């Protein structure tokens, strides 16, 4: 009877995937077993693999996934029989980030506590990963965006492939680069972090390797072979895991026309103190060079939320001087402002225009950079109210281990 029930559950779930519940499973009456199905587990030898498993939604993260990842990773960290941990995604994505359409509906329904819980569960897992005591391998074989970068970059090893697409596209939907992005982006070479955070434009797997976001690169068809080699390891030594990865890894060269080849130009344009100065500098270079890259970059900046651009620039600059936990605590405040606070209309408008109505014509408020005041930006970095608690991270406990 139990086996028949399990088989029926799998059939129902397969039908849900096939018939296109693409945006969110949060609104369905799901059992705890159904929710656990969003993060599967594989075990072999002394390794465990967490599999993000919402393929029709490109493995977008939910609150339950954040909690489940925390529970699994804490148990694995404490288990002396487990030496290292891996993470990968089902289907054609690693992870497209947080389930922003579900967040949009939570915002429009007026569910602030559920929004708080989402960010708390996700950011707490990211901190756990960033302080994890065992080697961690993230296999980024596909779309890796937004929160998907947050649940992978803080780990020990990140394997990119020819199918990897990296981006932090939050400003285009009226939000800010979060999930630890202000820490991760701010530590990239030169002003690459400012470019990625403000424009949300993409990097390839080879570009990720070149700038340090990835530690290794492999062709996607070789990923199963690499996984099998890793699963044979009986170790908790990161150098042994690294040696295995390096035996499977390949040399990758970024495209000659890509952004990695333009580090000097990024320094020239994105080192300015304000978004207005950055745009002015790009416009000068575009007129001088007649370069399609400059034109594409300018167009993307002008399509993004003016407030989000200024917030993102300040966030990345602050992140350069902060630890991961400080960045996550600050980003938590910012995320609540962006979804619950007085300026949350930009997020709703961005998601509506890009993902709901898809008219690609968001009406930003303020509508232009010159109308974004310093007070507006300052408010984005403040707690919602004087009594609003900050994100509670176990900093003393984790850093004393």
Curated annotation (Swiss-Prot):
CDD domains registered for this protein in UniProt: crotonase-like
Query: Which family does the entry's similarity section mention?
Result: Belongs to the enoyl-CoA hydratase/isomerase family.
Could you tell me the superkingdom of the organism this chain comes from? Eukaryota
- For this protein, the Enzyme Commission number is 3.1.2.-
Under the heading Gene3D superfamilies, the entry gives:
2-enoyl-CoA Hydratase, Chain A, domain 1
Q: Where is it predominantly found? A: mitochondrion
Name of the protein: 3-hydroxyisobutyryl-CoA hydrolase-like protein 1, mitochondrial
Q: Please name one Pfam family that this protein belongs to.
A: ECH_2
Sorted UniProt keywords: Hydrolase, Mitochondrion, Transit peptide
Q: Name one GO cellular component term.
A: mitochondrion
Q: Name one GO molecular function term.
A: 3-hydroxyisobutyryl-CoA hydrolase activity
Report the locations given in the UniProt record: Mitochondrion
Residue interval of the organelle targeting sequence: 1-26
